[in-house]
C-alpha cells in the first residue's frame, strides 16, 4: 500500500514538475517574442503548431469523441477555452511593455486567490493564513510602490501592470473551471479544444482588424513558432494531468517554482535586470508562501 501511494505521489509531482519547467520556458519565450510581433499574429501562428501537436495526441488518445462534440459539452469547452484565449491575449500585451518579474509577481497573487478559494475549508482559524497574507500583501505593496515611484511618468509601466493583472484574473477562472471539467473530459480533450479555440479566435480577430507591426525589427520565422509552441504544448498537457490528480491549490503551489525559474532565465539569457527593491519584494512574497504551507 505504501509503495502504491508513493508511486501515485511521485507521478503526480512528476506531472506538475514537468509543467512548471516548461511553463517557465514558455513565459521566457513569450517575453522575448512578444516584442517582435503583434499579439494576435503571434498567438495565431503559435496556435497552429500547438493545435497540430495536441491534435495528434487527441486523435490517438481521445476516449470519447462524441462526448466532446455533444452540444452542451461543446459549449462548456468553448466557454472555458475562450477564457484561456483572453488570458493569453492580455499576457502577450503585458509582455510587450513589461517584464518577467512583473508577470511573476502577479502569478504569486494568483496562487493566493486560487489557494484560498480551493482550500479555504482547510484553514480552521484566521491565524493559519493571516501571516501569509500579510507577508504577501506587504511584498506586493512594496513592489507596486517602488514601480510607480520609479516609473512615475512612464505610461507603459501602468499598462503592463494592468495587462498582467487582467491576464491573471482570467487564468484564475480558467484553472478552477478546468479542474471542474477534468471530472468529465480528459486532459487531451480540454487541451485540444482550447488550442483550436485560440486559433479560431485569433484568426477571426486578425481578419476583422489588421494589427500594426511597424515596431517589428525582424520577422519571426516558422521554426521559431515551432520552438514557442512545443514547450506550452508539453506544459498544458502535463499541467492538466497533474491538476486531475490533485487540485488547483497544489497545482498553483507547485507552480511557484515557475516564477523563480522564469526570473533566472530572464536574468541569465536575456540579461534582464531590475532594481534591488523589485527582487526584494519578490522574495518577501515567496516567504509568504512558505508560511502558507509550501
What are these model-derived regions, one by one?
Residues 2-41, 132-136, 153-189, 227-230, ...:
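Glycine-/small-residue-enriched transmembrane alpha-helix faces in small-molecule transporters
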Residues 12, 21-29, 36-86, 134-142, ...:
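Transmembrane alpha-helices of multi-pass small-molecule transport proteins
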Residues 12-19, 58, 65-90, 157-169, ...:
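Loop-to-transmembrane-helix transition segments
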Residues 24, 81, 85-86, 111-116, ...:
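Hydrophobic/small/kink-forming positions within alpha-helical transmembrane segments
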Residues 35-41, 90-106, 122-124, 183-190, ...:
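Structural motif at transmembrane-helix junctions in multi-pass transporters
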Residues 49-53, 106-121, 197-201, 235-238, ...:
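Alpha-helical transmembrane segments of compact multi-pass small-molecule transporters, enriched
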Residues 54, 109-116, 125-147, 277-294:
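Hydrophobic transmembrane alpha-helices of multi-pass small-molecule transport proteins
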Residues 62-72, 119-126, 151-152, 176-189, ...:
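Membrane-interface helix termini and inter-helical loops of multi-pass transporters
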